[in-house]
From Swiss-Prot:
The keyword Metal-binding does not apply. PSII is composed of 1 copy each of membrane proteins PsbA, PsbB, PsbC, PsbD, PsbE, PsbF, PsbH, PsbI, PsbJ, PsbK, PsbL, PsbM, PsbT, PsbX, PsbY, PsbZ, Psb30/Ycf12, at least 3 peripheral proteins of the oxygen-evolving complex and a large number of cofactors. It forms dimeric complexes. One of its GO terms (cellular component) is photosystem II reaction center. HAMAP family: PSII_PsbK. Residues 1-22 form a propeptide. This is Photosystem II reaction center protein K. One of the components of the core complex of photosystem II (PSII). PSII is a light-driven water:plastoquinone oxidoreductase that uses light energy to abstract electrons from H(2)O, generating O(2) and a proton gradient subsequently used for ATP formation. It consists of a core antenna complex that captures photons, and an electron transfer chain that converts photonic excitation into a charge separation. The chain crosses the membrane at residues 30-50. Belongs to the PsbK family. Keywords: Chloroplast, Membrane, Photosynthesis, Photosystem II, Plastid, Reaction center, Thylakoid, Transmembrane, Transmembrane helix. It is a single-pass membrane protein. InterPro entries: PSII_PsbK, PSII_PsbK_sf. It comes from Silene latifolia (White campion).
Length: 59
């Protein structure tokens, strides 16, 4: 079965040492949690559109 978490990049937080994901340079290592979350941000905008339409009663 296809794992949905692998599609949206959440497993990068769990398997950040995997060879599939590149490591950040040392100067940017503190940004690693943000970079791991970045693939999910477009989905949040997609969900925000539904919340917005629910707030205006799907006019």
């Amino acid at each position: 079965m296809l794992n949905i978490f692998s599609l949206i990049g959440l497993n990068s937080a769990l398997y950040s040492s995997s060879c599939f994901f590149a490591k950040l340079p040392e100067a940017y290592a503190f940004l690693s949690p943000i970079v791991d979350f970045m693939p999910v941000i477009p989905l949040l905008f997609f969900l925000l559109a539904f919340v917005w339409q629910a707030a205006v009663s799907f006019r």
